């Protein structure tokens, strides 16, 4: 066994899989741009208190899962980001983005870190993409980010996804509901696990998010938050549902859905895939009007957003066979060196081909012509260009189509022109 191994909870991504990541990222960039969202990139670590205030001190993320350390000269704890939304809001507030443009539409693709038990689709270092719509307080804004997310899934060809949605109401609604939950769960205090007992005092809504099988029946009998919503909250939620129906986006109201972060209010949603087993969430989000004030803003910044786990998305796509046609694309041409004393000349031709925008490969290991041809076919090159004494003497080069075996003889300039046209055609495809 090699002396050094990847750290538990991390993994290497090799070229074939990296091509899948690149494909998904390309679709994310395209659909986000279609909706008028611009990319933002924030630091991978922030002051720990940003997440304590933003995510919520009673959440599992803050209580158990953050990678925190103390290298700051002033003794302030730093944390590798466990989620993106708090950092995006911090960036918007710190840089006064909303004063120059009262509505900000931002999206991201980034690495995150949590101390979770490693399993399929859940690593300690993982990736998410998502979008945040800042500065708009309306059902239309929530519907906008949901529609963006669902169109993105559709563009990737995903099937059989379920959109679950609920209203968490406003602060007053949740305070009334909090009291109702405490009244309901307190008589069952001895049946609760340690985490739920702690949540009962600090934030009983978190009990509804428990994954403990022994508590599922008890949770199922709990009061519904929906029954504690005021008329304004109900109307807000119904308007979101109206927009989804107008756009033919199927949904299921899940009265137990609370999400795992404390900053959500009003609409919350989650998308699940049956391909992922018990841990079936592929992404989700909601509205978070109070986050800016939690981070020290003197004014409210209404906001809505979503995040999708890349690893879980890729697992779902793999299980649905969506990568079957995404074979790695080989070079357009493989330069075959027939005599090694011409290797330097061949490298000069390779440089000219690449400079012209033609994807070109060449053997750098001085292997036999037979081995070079075997490699050209293995990596699915479209053409082989032969460099030998005859070609150097006459200035005419043999170009072989490796799919049809048809071979033609051309000047180097004609080869460049032919392959350049092919390369442009591939880019247009």
Curated annotation (Swiss-Prot):
EC number in record: 6.1.1.21
Gene3D superfamilies hit by this protein: Anticodon-binding domain, Bira Bifunctional Protein, Domain 2
The organism's place on the tree of life at top rank: Bacteria
Catalytic reaction list: tRNA(His) + L-histidine + ATP = L-histidyl-tRNA(His) + AMP + diphosphate + H(+)
Coiled coil regions, renumbered to chain: none
Record carries keyword Amino-acid biosynthesis: no
Record keywords: Aminoacyl-tRNA synthetase, ATP-binding, Cytoplasm, Ligase, Nucleotide-binding, Protein biosynthesis
GO biological process: histidyl-tRNA aminoacylation
Pfam families for this protein: HGTP_anticodon, tRNA-synt_His
Chief subcellular location: cytoplasm
Keyword ATP-binding carried by entry: yes
CDD domains reported in the protein's UniProt record: HisRS-like_core (cd00773), HisRS_anticodon (cd00859)
Gene Ontology MF terms: ATP binding; histidine-tRNA ligase activity
Subunit structure: Homodimer.
Family: Belongs to the class-II aminoacyl-tRNA synthetase family.
PANTHER family linked to this entry: HISTIDINE--TRNA LIGASE, MITOCHONDRIAL-RELATED, HISTIDYL-TRNA SYNTHETASE
Protein name per Swiss-Prot or TrEMBL: Histidine--tRNA ligase
């Amino acid at each position: 066994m090699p002396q050094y191994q990847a750290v538990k909870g991390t993994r290497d991504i090799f070229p074939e899989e990296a091509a899948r990541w690149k494909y998904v990222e390309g679709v994310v960039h395209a659909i986000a741009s279609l909706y008028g969202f611009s990319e933002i990139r924030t630091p991978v670590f922030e002051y720990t208190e940003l997440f304590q205030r933003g995510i919520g001190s009673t959440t599992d993320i803050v209580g158990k899962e953050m990678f925190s350390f103390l290298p700051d000269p002033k003794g302030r704890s730093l944390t590798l980001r466990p989620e993106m939304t708090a950092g995006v809001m911090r960036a918007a507030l710190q840089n006064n983005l909303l004063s120059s443009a009262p509505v900000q539409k931002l999206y991201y693709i980034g690495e995150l870190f949590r101390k979770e038990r490693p399993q399929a689709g859940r690593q300690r270092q993982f990736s998410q993409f998502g979008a945040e719509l800042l500065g708009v307080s309306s059902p239309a804004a929530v519907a906008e980010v949901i529609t963006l997310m669902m169109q993105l899934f559709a563009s990737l060809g995903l099937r059989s996804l379920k959109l679950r949605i609920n209203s968490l109401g406003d602060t007053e609604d949740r305070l009334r509901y909090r009291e109702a939950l405490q009244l309901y769960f307190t008589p069952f205090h001895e049946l609760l696990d340690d985490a739920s007992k702690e949540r009962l005092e600090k934030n009983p809504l978190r009990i509804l998010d428990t994954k403990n099988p022994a508590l599922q029946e008890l949770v199922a009998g709990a009061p519904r938050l929906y029954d504690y919503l005021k008329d304004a909250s109900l109307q807000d939620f119904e308007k979101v549902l109206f927009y989804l129906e107008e756009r033919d986006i199927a949904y299921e109201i899940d009265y137990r859905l609370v999400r795992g972060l404390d900053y959500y209010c009003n609409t919350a949603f989650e998308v699940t895939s049956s391909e992922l087993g018990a841990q079936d969430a592929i992404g989700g989000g909601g509205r978070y009007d109070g986050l800016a004030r939690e981070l020290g803003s003197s004014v409210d910044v209404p906001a809505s957003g979503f995040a999708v786990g890349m690893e879980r998305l890729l697992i779902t796509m793999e299980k649905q066979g969506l990568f079957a046609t995404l074979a790695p694309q080989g070079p357009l041409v493989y330069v075959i060196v027939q005599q090694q004393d011409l290797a330097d000349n061949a490298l000069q031709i390779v440089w000219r081909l690449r400079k012209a925008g033609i994807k070109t490969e060449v053997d750098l290991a001085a292997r036999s012509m037979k081995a070079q041809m075997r490699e050209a076919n293995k990596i699915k090159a479209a053409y082989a260009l032969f460099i030998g004494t005859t070609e150097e003497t006459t200035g005419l080069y043999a170009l072989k189509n490796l799919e049809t075996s048809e071979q033609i003889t051309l000047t180097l300039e004609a080869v460049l022109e032919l392959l350049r046209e092919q390369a442009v055609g591939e880019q247009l495809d």
